[in-house]
From Swiss-Prot:
An annotated Gene Ontology molecular function: DNA binding
Record localization: Host nucleus
Organismal lineage: Viruses, Duplodnaviria, Heunggongvirae, Peploviricota, Herviviricetes
One GO biological process term: viral DNA genome replication
Organism: Epstein-Barr virus (strain AG876)
SUPFAM superfamilies: DNA/RNA polymerases, Ribonuclease H-like
Protein name from the UniProt record: DNA polymerase catalytic subunit
Amino acid sequence: MSGGLFYNPFLRPNKGLLKKPDKEYLRLIPKCFQTPGAAGVVDVRGPQPPLCFYQDSLTVVGGDEDGKGMWWRQRAQEGTARPEADTHGSPLDFHVYDILETVYTHEKCAVIPSDKQGYVVPCGIVIKLLGRRKADGASVCVNVFGQQAYFYASAPQGLDVEFAVLSALKASTFDRRTPCRVSVEKVTRRSIMGYGNHAGDYHKITLSHPNSVCHVATWLQDKHGCRIFEANVDATRRFVLDNDFVTFGWYSCRRAIPRLQHRDSYAELEYDCEVGDLSVRREDSSWPSYQALAFDIECLGEEGFPTATNEADLILQISCVLWSTGEEAGRYRRILLTLGTCEDIEGVEVYEFPSELDMLYAFFQLIRDLSVEIVTGYNVANFDWPYILDRARHIYSINPASLGKIRAGGVCEVRRPHDAGKGFLRANTKVRITGLIPIDMYAVCRDKLSLSDYKLDTVARHLLGAKKEDVHYKEIPRLFAAGPEGRRRLGMYCVQDSALVMDLLNHFVIHVEVAEIAKIAHIPCRRVLDDGQQIRVFSCLLAAAQKENFILPMPSASDRDGYQGATVIQPLSGFYNSPVLVVDFASLYPSIIQAHNLCYSTMITPGEEHRLAGLRPGEDYESFRLTGGVYHFVKKHVHESFLASLLTSWLAKRKAIKKLLAACEDPRQRTILDKQQLAIKCTCNAVYGFTGVANGLFPCLSIAETVTLQGRTMLERAKAFVEALSPANLQALAPSPDAWAPLNPEGQLRVIYGDTDSLFIECRGFSESETLRFAEALAAHTTRSLFVAPISLEAEKTFSCLMLITKKRYVGVLTDGKTLMKGVELVRKTACKFVQTRCRRVLDLVLADARVKEAASLLSHRPFQESFTQGLPVGFLPVIDILNQAYTDLREGRVPMGELCFSTELSRKLSAYKSTQMPHLAVYQKFVERNEELPQIHDRIQYVFVEPKGGVKGARKTEMAEDPAYAERHGVPVAVDHYFDKLLQGAANILQCLFDNNSGAALSVLQNFTARPPF
């Protein structure tokens, strides 16, 4: 749109344009709209509702009471608005992606069907199912009546439980405002905690308001000494587990009553029903066409990096890339919301707004009225979402939750951890928005990739082969103030970022993975990424126990005592120039739980030995000496472990899914099956951690300690067994006498490291081909000889050479030629490129050159002092040559200035630093003295180290720090010795395993044998 067609009604008001509503709006309008290039904003207040310009037309952003705003009206004009529901109750098939828990009070009786009113007097839980109708894909909200919230209590003899519950409610200020219906009944249940518990009488306490559960449970426990069970189970989980429903999938409702007025949601269709009307269609794993949105914002930083609470730091543009999950990846609808005029962008719908307030309303209503279910972005949890919500709330007093999918009671918030201020991009922030599945692709990429950094450009290059056009935030004010053409360039960059993020979503198919985890774990999709693994296992255990009439007690302080975690077989550090075979226990901790039938329900604790009466040691139960004494676990034929049963059923299901996957040819179905098996794998691996987290939902550290104890024992037994095998024993493992050529009779196996579930076996005297030949047979033979199913050892990989530094830190070359690094940072990421590249050359030489490898092996098996008395092996001299050449390059100025640069972020104003004795601050002060342009907060300040004036030895780093551009322009010599020392320190860290695993010793050797030419 050209600049001449756009006018700002708040700078040039047209009073006859619109009828004025009663509400007054604050608008912050950039001054550059009046005066090109001007900075700052104009504060305008007026009654005009939010407005938008699109294709030369002015439209009101908002809508009527039914929420039909500009996006809805646009759909109606295009013929894509959905039909209304029938006016009578009829069967309904629909897909659910989110489940919400709400509460109705008796005031709602006037707007709900008469047969549902009894559920909400004086108040009652209403479960809302959000999803899509099967018939036409319309968005739906189904209000489900009849679900209860409840918990269990074991009461002392003679206690009137119902009276105690009513007393608790009367003591609650909350209940005086919202009266709660109470039901107490005696039921027969068994506690899951401990073997030998008999079925007994428990009180099931049902409350019509879920917020009363915690208060009443605490009251009964503290005031009356009751033992409380399952008070931490919310109504949503009760709804799913009590009725065997799913959290993501197809439902059928035999009688769905349309709600045509007084709706709770902004969904296209809304219905009322009862729990008993619903059933699940598990056989159908297909998806409807859900709407995914990737967004990005561009902000104006008046005083450096944008700050949401600064009025002038406006959001200038919001890019919105929409994709329907039923479409091919890449078929996106691209939308740009922008302040002011903007030239056309090919393939992008450009909507222009007179102020930030108008644009924010349009953004929130886009999510609502275009029925968005999945929202993604890149680092949006830490920046974009907090920025948008802070602007909306604190600058404009907008309640974003009121513009969401639910008219009342919705949530729209960002939960920042307590340490969020310690590092940009490093805090685990949670976004909770009613009716949306938030997926931050930054967090996904950090979890699934191993890269030097996780900037969007780096990730896009690595995964998509795409180059991201970047605009520095310093350029944004200039581009925006430049007018329509500048905003076009800024908009192209903004839209490009959102499109790349949507490409990443499709690359990982993370939305399908989230849905599959939600289904197996019985939790809503929006809780999968942010709520950790505890809730997944807890819900599954709850479901399994419920089927057998067991109940779960609330954790007590005694459940949270500490225990000794997993240990390792200490590494024999050094360089190994012979094959190193790595064998792994497949799913070690889950297999231990299965093999030893470990569970809350199979455990007999110290002092409870009378429960062993009639049981035979070794045959009916196993005993383990732990920190707190001797614990016993009965075997499967006595009572099957719930945890083991869950694992067995999951693994059997995973095996069946993988079989289907192998035969499946439909790409979409293959994706779903693959994510299903991955979801099962993730959940299985979480079971051990669930028992071992002291502040978790249901900790039992004695189970976790038993698992780690068995893990240690298994490693030690496997080590002794493997080291006792001779070449003849290995030869006997051949499938037939003539299958293998004779093995080296001088060969020897030695375990050089054991890491939780892995053994590193040095195959001394055996060739690489011989090692590969017997690897699988060795693992299988050890499994058969030592362990019971399902515990299994597998040959995972073989190194042709290995640098073993310390536990969980090693570098080696695999037999396929690839280099594998674990826990090793060649040099610090903050090191300059000069140090990084030279250190990499040293490592590559040690791992690849045959003579250097022989020398490295010799060095690692002798005391480092011998290097001073006997000299270095000749084969190691090429390493010294690399270091000497690096020194020469420094001395003769052949190292580009760019390779010598360091950089540090200016995290706050200079006056806010307690100490300014830091290199980057020294350079900042030089900028001030030279009257040069100053870096802004969050800018990275580059610096190099130069020779101190007068060649003073021992000068501080702050005295040596200089601006790289200034140093290059004026020919200031760099601090050669300083950089060379940095290089030697980096090389010593890599080579320390050659010198008694001591980086100080390695540094002294390198300093002794490198030749610094005299000045």
